[in-house]
UniProtKB/Swiss-Prot annotation:
CDD domains: ATP-synt_Fo_a_6 (cd00310). The keyword Plastid does not apply. This is ATP synthase subunit a. Belongs to the ATPase A chain family. GO terms for molecular function: proton-transporting ATP synthase activity, rotational mechanism. It comes from Bartonella bacilliformis (strain ATCC 35685 / KC583 / Herrer 020/F12,63). F-type ATPases have 2 components, CF(1) - the catalytic core - and CF(0) - the membrane proton channel. CF(1) has five subunits: alpha(3), beta(3), gamma(1), delta(1), epsilon(1). CF(0) has three main subunits: a(1), b(2) and c(9-12). The alpha and beta chains form an alternating ring which encloses part of the gamma chain. CF(1) is attached to CF(0) by a central stalk formed by the gamma and epsilon chains, while a peripheral stalk is formed by the delta and b chains. Its main location: membrane. InterPro entries: ATP_synth_F0_asu, ATP_synth_F0_asu_AS, ATP_synth_F0_asu_bact/mt, F0_ATP_A_sf.
């Protein structure tokens, strides 16, 4: 949704805004860098404004921030217990960042940073590395019990352990791909339909009549994309809470 180029993939192109290179290393400031900073700034400003003047009868902004707080807190408590609340700052930051980034990308000419696999994979790796680091810090070598389910017959225990290890280290892949693929597919679909409408209108009166149905579809898909933007942030947060439970309670 970031341009009117005929190619629906063009909107995901990474472009340099400020060229910076040191030796053979490229440190250029890109459109992705800009929208990452914009997402952080907008999230921070919204949370600051909504929480700076708290009222007994909450404003709309205060209600939204309190709902986000309660959602993350309750999800974390249900998944990892009271001990899991120490991860609240991380989980809340991830939820707000992904949600705001997804919503920003729905506006014309704005870039969707969550449609870049490098961004979503970085967020997923942050979660998994936190699980591993905190798990070993809290339990030491006992964290490895995560890969040895209790009650499994000795004969098949090695096989089950291998499956558990593969499953654990595939988490960042599935977590990142889910968010990346949904945002990418949705924006490509919108671009295709909007491009079709422009092409139909260019045909004249008959084309205008034929563009009504695609226009209705585009509006419906746009509304659906707002829902998907929230759901993907929701799913990422829920799965993050479930994974962080392994750092607190590694035993099956």
């Amino acid at each position: 949704m970031t341009s009117h180029a005929p190619d629906p993939i063009h909107q995901f192109e990474i472009s340099r805004l400020i060229n910076v290179s040191i030796g053979n290393v490229d440190f250029s400031f890109t459109n992705v860098s800009f929208f990452i900073i914009a997402t952080v700034v907008l999230s921070s400003v919204f949370l600051f404004i909504s929480s700076s003047s708290r009222r007994l009868v909450p404003t709309r902004m205060q209600s939204i921030s309190e709902m986000a707080y309660e959602f993350v807190a309750s999800t974390l408590r249900e998944s990892a217990g009271v001990q899991g609340m120490k991860f609240f700052p991380l989980v809340f930051s991830l939820f707000v960042f992904i949600l705001v980034a997804n919503f920003i990308g729905l506006f014309p000419y704005f870039y969707t940073i969550t449609s870049q696999i490098m961004i979503t994979f970085s967020l997923a790796m942050l979660v998994i590395l936190t699980v591993i680091g905190c798990g070993f810090y809290k339990h030491g070598i006992g964290f490895l019990k995560l890969f040895v389910p209790s009650g499994v017959p000795v004969m098949i225990l090695p096989l089950v352990t291998v499956i558990e290890v593969i499953s654990f280290f595939s988490r960042p892949i599935s977590l990142s791909l889910r968010l990346f693929a949904n945002m990418l597919a949705g924006h490509i679909t919108l671009k295709v339909f909007s491009g079709f409408i422009v092409s139909m209108v260019g045909l004249g009166f008959i084309g205008v009549g034929g563009s009504i149905l695609p226009l209705i579809m585009t509006v419906a898909i746009t509304a659906l994309e707002f829902l998907v933007a929230f759901l993907q942030a929701y799913v990422f947060t829920v799965l993050t809470c479930m994974y962080l439970n392994d750092a607190v309670h590694p035993g099956h």
